[in-house]
């Protein structure tokens, strides 16, 4: 809506008043000026510059470098100082450890004559000096070495053994609050070198932690974990170290986020996992869209932060920091960028089956009955196990199975069955319940034993368990559209999520939501009213593709199964809306259509191969395979007819894409990080997200004794990785010119031929798109630099 002249004038007056009070540029329209690339300070290693993503350390930001002793932390910081000075900048070094070696710094390229050095007496003095230098606006980079040496004045003036709990953490928090604004305004980069300490009593995971509290983790735009990997040798002489730097950033999930462990079948809340440092497994997504179980290897409590909520179709809500990456049908996007109507990735299928049978199928079915409608005896076995159900077919089935386990079933009225062992025989039903962990448990405490989540369990074992559950507390209903729904209702939250994940093994999609027992379902085909004073959870299967898959996967001879089978033919007549699992990701549409065009497959040919399920070929190939998105069943039929590997690879993706119904307002919450081994993703609240610590980018380079980071060695490593330098045996070759035999000789060649080294560096940066040059008029080519996420 266009603003009226009076409102525009009022806004101009307000902006003028703000600029008068706080300076020009305090308020601006984002479209008034072109966005400039982030200015950076090179680190001296092209590999590390690439890992940072923008060609170096960002100016105007806080950087934390931490790691074990003698790992190369100070060397990395001094190289940044040398590069800042080489560009004409001014550098300062706050030597709180009183351990700076001027000769070593000079060998790394630092201009020690112009370097500002301070060796403060207390932590307050060090941070105050740094703050004053930053606020001068004349400084390009300042290094504080180290956080552990920033000892508060009160501790220095006290006696040995005095306790000063949290004093240094409060000092760091206050200093960073003051400094961050000044750093941004002056464009100064502040590097804090930090040390590692070990937490006492840690049983699982790494006990390592950094000093100075948690404030630095939050204020740091970039955190770098420096580790020495191996010793470099020239013959038998050690000449340096191979160093690995992991670039760490903080993106987090909020407390309350539920994470499923596919190994134990247990759903955990993320705060319980982190606080207890539980060595759980999670479901993680690979780049090809397949799902795998992977262990959690690190746990991080990231404090209280702003989080936003994404309400997904089906009821799931994910709360995450706005910069946390979520997998969408167009790739990874920050949670804060997502809007209502966008689609996010959820599991479509997971794990599959083998041929293992930990218990017979009849026993699995009995467990399903007893989890749903059983009231198990108390420990001691004197109280019989009761099965309460009105269906005669189920009562007869329980009676028959109990007889094979040394038990007799005695009717207790019309709907109850008491199961007790026969004289002289062992109570096999009680043994089965105890083995499964449900003996003596109340309804809301019951769960499915972890054997059912073994990767090689047979499908009929799981199918019979689900049969027993479905026939006890399940239901079938009809929507207003005529489509069917199937579900299961329970007071056990763990049980509801376990059923959801077992259904995914059959490729049956479902949702878990809170259920209000006072609500009336649209039209019950077969089921019963739920009455409970406790919280109730519902597993709901929607979409005729999922309902049909459920009917094909689980035995259907019971009363509810028979009702479902009878209702399916009518429900599948005409056009019925399927679930989101029916469709491929929108990102795949062009790839599939272009491939078929290149292969020479016409719309008419594709329609003939697909058959009656095909779309109208007069609308082209896209209409044949779907409409706005391609239908999985049609692409599957075409892939089978063509026996085409490319199409089968596309269909191997185990994800579906569900729409975001609502973006919830920001709130404050505790947030947590996990590090997931290898794949660096996980399924949280049923949505695929980056593991809270996103895939760490790593860089490896050589630090030579007395020389520092080997720029030339890093260029050789990156050149080989990017295909610019060819390695054949021990020889390194660049554009037909031999650099030398062995890395040391190739390194010496680049030292002596700086123009070749510069050319290789330029080509690496151009290929990877880093190291943008700031121009006077960035709009000359009509393209603005991409924003950089820190």
From Swiss-Prot:
Name of a matching Pfam family: RecA
InterPro entries assigned: AAA+_ATPase (IPR003593), DNA_recomb/repair_RecA (IPR013765), DNA_recomb/repair_RecA_CS (IPR020584), Hint_dom_C (IPR003586), Hint_dom_N (IPR003587), Hint_dom_sf (IPR036844), Homing_endonucl (IPR027434), INTEIN (IPR006142)
Gene Ontology cellular component terms for the protein in this record: cytosol
GO biological process: DNA damage response; DNA strand invasion; intein-mediated protein splicing; intron homing; recombinational repair; response to antibiotic; SOS response; UV protection
Residues the record lists as binding ATP: 67-74
Induction profile: By DNA damage, and by ADP-ribosylation catalyzed by DarT (at protein level).
One MF term in the entry's GO annotations: ATP hydrolysis activity
The entry's keywords: ATP-binding, Autocatalytic cleavage, Cytoplasm, DNA damage, DNA recombination, DNA repair, DNA-binding, Endonuclease, Hydrolase, Intron homing, Isopeptide bond, Nuclease, Nucleotide-binding, Protein splicing, SOS response, Ubl conjugation
Cytoplasm as UniProt keyword: yes
Modification(s) after translation: This protein undergoes a protein self splicing that involves a post-translational excision of the intervening region (intein) followed by peptide ligation.
Subcellular location: Cytoplasm
Primary site of residence: cytoplasm
Enzyme type, top EC level: hydrolase
EC number annotated for this UniProt entry: 3.1.-.-
Location of cross-link Isoglutamyl lysine isopeptide (Lys-Gln) (interchain with Q-Cter in protein Pup): 762
DOD-type homing endonuclease domain: residues covered: 366-508
Record flagged with keyword Nuclease: yes
Top-level taxon of the source organism: Bacteria
SUBUNIT field: Interacts with UvrD1 and UvrA. Co-immunoprecipitates with DarG in the presence and absence of darT.
HAMAP family: RecA
Function in brief: Can catalyze the hydrolysis of ATP in the presence of single-stranded DNA, the ATP-dependent uptake of single-stranded DNA by duplex DNA, and the ATP-dependent hybridization of homologous single-stranded DNAs. It interacts with LexA causing its activation and leading to its autocatalytic cleavage. PI-MtuI is an endonuclease.
Family statement drawn from the similarity comment of this UniProt entry: Belongs to the RecA family.
NCBIfam families in UniProt: intein_Cterm (TIGR01443), intein_Nterm (TIGR01445), PRK09519.1 (NF007072), tigrfam_recA (TIGR02012)
Stated name of the protein: Protein RecA
Annotated source species: Mycobacterium tuberculosis (strain ATCC 25618 / H37Rv)
């Amino acid at each position: 809506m266009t603003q009226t002249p009076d409102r525009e004038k009022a806004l101009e007056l307000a902006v003028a008043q703000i600029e008068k009070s706080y300076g020009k540029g305090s308020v601006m329209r984002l479209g008034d000026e072109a966005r400039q690339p982030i200015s950076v300070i090179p680190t001296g290693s092209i590999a590390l510059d690439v890992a940072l993503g923008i060609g170096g350390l960002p100016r105007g930001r806080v950087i934390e470098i931490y790691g074990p002793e003698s790992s190369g932390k100070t060397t990395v910081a001094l190289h940044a100082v040398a590069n800042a000075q080489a560009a004409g900048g001014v550098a300062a070094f706050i030597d709180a450890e009183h351990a700076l070696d001027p000769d070593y710094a000079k060998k790394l390229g630092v201009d020690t004559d112009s370097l500002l050095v301070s060796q403060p007496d207390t932590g307050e003095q060090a941070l105050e000096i740094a703050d004053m230098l930053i606020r001068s606006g004349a400084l390009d980079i300042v290094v504080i070495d180290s956080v552990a040496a920033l000892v508060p004045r009160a501790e220095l003036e006290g006696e040995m053994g005095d306790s000063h709990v949290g004093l240094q953490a409060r000092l760091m928090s206050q200093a960073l609050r003051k400094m961050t604004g000044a750093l941004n305004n002056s464009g100064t980069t502040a590097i804090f070198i930090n040390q590692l300490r070990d937490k006492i009593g840690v049983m699982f995971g790494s006990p390592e932690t950094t000093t100075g509290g948690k404030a630095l983790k939050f204020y740091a735009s970039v955190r770098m974990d420096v580790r020495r990997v191996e010793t470099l040798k020239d013959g038998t002489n050690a000449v340096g170290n191979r160093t690995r730097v992991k670039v760490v950033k903080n993106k987090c999930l909020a407390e309350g986020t539920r994470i499923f462990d596919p190994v134990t079948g247990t759903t955990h809340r993320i705060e319980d996992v982190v606080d207890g440092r539980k060595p759980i497994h999670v479901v993680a997504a690979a780049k090809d869209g397949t799902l795998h179980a992977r262990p959690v290897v690190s746990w991080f409590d990231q404090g209280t932060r702003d989080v936003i909520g994404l309400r997904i179709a089906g009821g799931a809500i994910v709360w995450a920091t706005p910069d946390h990456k979520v997998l969408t049908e167009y790739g990874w996007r920050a949670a804060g960028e997502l809007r209502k109507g966008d689609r996010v990735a959820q599991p479509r299928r997971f794990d599959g089956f083998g041929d293992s049978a930990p218990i017979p199928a009849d026993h699995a079915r009995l467990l399903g009955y007893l989890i749903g409608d059983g009231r198990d005896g108390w420990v001691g076995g004197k109280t019989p196990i009761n099965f309460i159900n009105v269906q005669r077919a189920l009562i007869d089935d329980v009676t028959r199975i109990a007889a094979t386990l040394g038990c007799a079933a005695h009717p207790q009225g019309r709907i109850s069955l008491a199961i007790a062992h026969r004289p002289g025989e062992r109570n096999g039903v009680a043994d089965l319940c105890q083995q499964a962990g449900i003996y003596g448990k109340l309804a809301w405490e019951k769960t499915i034993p972890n054997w059912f989540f073994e990767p090689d369990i047979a499908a009929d074992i799981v199918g019979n368990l689900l049969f027993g559950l479905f026939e006890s507390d399940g239901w079938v209903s009809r929507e207003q559209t005529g489509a069917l729904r199937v579900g299961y209702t329970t007071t056990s939250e763990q049980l509801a999520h376990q059923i959801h994940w077992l259904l995914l093994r059959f490729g049956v999609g479902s949702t878990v939501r809170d259920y209000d027992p006072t609500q009336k379902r649209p039209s019950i085909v077969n089921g019963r009213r739920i009455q409970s004073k406790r919280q109730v959870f519902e597993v709901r299967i929607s979409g005729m593709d999922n309902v049909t898959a459920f009917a094909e996967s689980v035995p259907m001879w019971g009363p509810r199964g028979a009702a479902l089978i009878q209702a399916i033919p009518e429900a599948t007549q005409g056009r019925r809306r399927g679930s989101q699992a029916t469709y491929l990701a929108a990102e795949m549409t062009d790839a599939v259509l272009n491939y078929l065009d290149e292969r020479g497959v016409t719309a008419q040919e594709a329609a003939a191969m697909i058959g009656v399920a095909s779309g109208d070929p007069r609308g082209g190939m896209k209409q044949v395979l779907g409409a706005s998105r391609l239908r999985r069943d049609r692409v599957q039929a075409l892939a089978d007819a063509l026996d085409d590997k490319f199409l089968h690879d596309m269909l191997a993706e185990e994800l579906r894409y569900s729409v975001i119904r609502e973006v919830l307002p920001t709130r404050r919450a505790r947030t947590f990080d996990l590090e997931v081994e290898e794949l660096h993703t996980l399924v949280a609240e049923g949505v695929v997200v980056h593991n809270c610590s996103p895939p760490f980018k790593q860089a490896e380079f050589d630090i030579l004794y007395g020389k520092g980071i080997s720029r030339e060695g890093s260029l050789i490593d990156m050149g080989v990785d990017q295909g610019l330098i060819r390695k054949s045996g021990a020889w390194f070759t660049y554009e037909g010119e031999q650099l030398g035999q062995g890395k040391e000789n190739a390194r010496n060649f680049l030292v002596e031929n700086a123009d070749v080294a510069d050319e290789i560096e330029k080509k690496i940066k151009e290929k990877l798109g880093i190291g943008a040059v700031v121009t006077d008029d960035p709009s000359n080519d009509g393209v603005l630099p991409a924003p950089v996420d820190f």
